[in-house]
Amino acid sequence: MPLNAVARRSRASSSDAPPGPKRDAILRAAIDTFAERGYFNAQVADVARAAGVAAGTVYLYFKSKDDLLVSIFERSMREGLAGSRAAIADLPDPPERLRRLARGHLARLGSDRNLAIVFQVELRQSTKFMERFSSTLLRDYLGLIRQAIADGQREGLFRADLNPTSTAKMLFGALDEMATNWILSRRKYSLEADADAVVDLFLNGAQAR
């Protein structure tokens, strides 16, 4: 089944599946398996083996391998959104909100290399999949960045000529590239530690003169 078709059905299929430790274990096994073998090379049987369950058990929770990938994306994005909203809930200062969002973004990926590989590499091999979700969960995430930029403009902190939506995508793109470089690098270093440098460079360009 094509990924875009599964994406349209993912909300129903995931919500119908019983939650619990076994489902979580299967998702964790899918993350590790997709990262190690590559999504297209991995089989449901590989995921089942990594989770310590029978292949048929996977289908009790997920409709297909595609549904597993969609579920990884949705759960991780929802957790990321919730964490980001909580992190900036008590921060009125727009620049500090951007800094907190950037740190959280890189900290989440930096704490789980296999999840980062799935997000930065495996999910992006399907254009249809990315098109399906670019206007939903990802849009909501970008909205947090956009709102901080717009608030900064209203307070006279950021340049008035900046388009908040485009500027939010620029900052997200910079963080995204840092995550990809971290995956590909042979050096071991803290991904989160790069957040301040990215935000400082961004703020220097966005600051009202």
What are these regions, as identified by a protein language model?
Residues 71, 85-114, 164, 168-171:
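Hydrophobic alpha-helical connector segments
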Residues 78-82, 129-155, 165-169, 173, ...:
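Amphipathic alpha-helical packing segments from all-alpha helical-bundle domains
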Residues 107-111, 147, 151, 171-189, ...:
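Amphipathic C-terminal alpha-helical segment
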